[in-house]
């Protein structure tokens, strides 16, 4: 149980922080100004099953790609990853992209390709579920805190 807690804690601290903040905080020096969600925007739950022997290594890759994506890509609006409390190898990532083009730029980016190529052998399964927000007016403000 302590190992699970430590993994979740390390990942949460290293990867990203979901927080409410005013619009001024979204445009800090360490973050690109974010684009607005467009009608063709994407809200996705990525469900990943990681091979247990690679979990620690996978977490490092995931933390890096999440951080770099939020810091450098205006169209990446949210990258919030969580691990199942009872099965830390089951990872779910809430991803939001301003539009289809932002998603295409993201998956073509150097940091995403590094993550994808570096973790492909670590992932047992991947399900990408595009979802529809129940209340489109409810916005998530996701940012990386400066160190």
Label every model-predicted segment:
Residues 17, 22-43, 80-87, 116-147:
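Glycine-rich beta-strand-turn "strand-cap" elements at beta-sheet edges
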Residues 1-8:
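Bacterial N-terminal signal peptides that target proteins for export
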Residues 43, 63-69:
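General detector of folded, globular domains
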Residues 49-58:
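Short, surface-exposed ligand-recognition loops at beta-strand->loop->(often short) alpha-helix junctions
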Residues 25-27, 68-78, 96-132:
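An amphipathic, aromatic/His-enriched active-site/gating alpha helix that lines ligand/cofactor pockets
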Residues 8-17:
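Bacterial N-terminal signal peptides
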Residues 41-49, 78-107:
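Short, well-ordered beta-strand segments in beta-rich or mixed alpha/beta enzyme
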């Amino acid at each position: 149980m302590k190992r699970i807690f430590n993994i979740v804690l390390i990942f949460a601290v290293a990867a990203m922080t979901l927080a409410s903040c005013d619009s001024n905080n979204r445009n800090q020096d360490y973050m690109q100004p974010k684009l607005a969600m467009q009608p063709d925007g994407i809200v996705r739950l990525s469900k990943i099953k990681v091979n247990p022997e690679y979990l620690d290594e996978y977490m490092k890759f995931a933390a890096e790609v999440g951080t770099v994506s939020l810091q450098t890509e205006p169209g990446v609006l949210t990258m919030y990853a969580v691990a199942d409390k009872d099965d830390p190898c089951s990872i779910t990532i809430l991803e939001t992209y301003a539009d289809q083009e932002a998603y295409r730029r993201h998956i073509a980016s150097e940091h995403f390709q590094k993550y994808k190529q570096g973790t492909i052998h670590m992932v047992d399964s991947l399900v990408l579920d595009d979802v529809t927000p129940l209340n489109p007016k409810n916005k998530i403000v996701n940012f990386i805190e400066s160190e």
